[in-house]
A protein has these predicted regions:
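Active-site cofactor/cluster-binding pocket
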Residues: 2-122
């Protein structure tokens, strides 16, 4: 999995000087890791810079450590909060297994930031 992790910063993925280009970010993890909170914080940061934002969360059995993921879209001319497969600029993964599950959303040359700490199912 190391070949999909790019050690560059995310500054070029979330460049606020060019909001004409949409940015698609998928955040994923398991219930209790703060995935939805992180999504809301990123959305609030973008909105504070007058960048249009759309987001959607999917929370499945979250209170029991179930899968949680958020789609966060920034930029102009957004018509849906959902990110199409193969179009995410960035995946932020709080749990490695959930990150692998979201890889189909990543576009070619997209970036992945992932925690190496796996959450064992109970």
């Amino acid at each position: 999995m190391n070949n999909i992790v790019n050690n560059t910063t995310t500054a070029n993925v979330i460049n606020t000087s060019d909001i004409a280009t949409n940015r698609n970010i998928v955040l994923c993890g398991v219930g209790g890791q703060g995935t939805v909170l992180a999504s809301k914080l990123l959305a609030a940061a973008a909105m504070s810079k007058d960048i249009p934002v759309m987001s959607a969360e999917t929370i499945g059995m979250a209170q029991r450590g179930g899968s949680v993921f958020s789609h966060l879209r920034m930029g102009k001319n957004l018509y849906s909060p959902m990110i199409k497969t193969g179009t995410a600029d960035l995946i932020i993964g709080f749990e490695p297994g959930e990150t692998v599950r979201m890889l189909p959303y990543l576009k070619e040359h997209g970036q992945v930031v992932v925690s190496t700490h796996a959450i064992k199912p109970v």
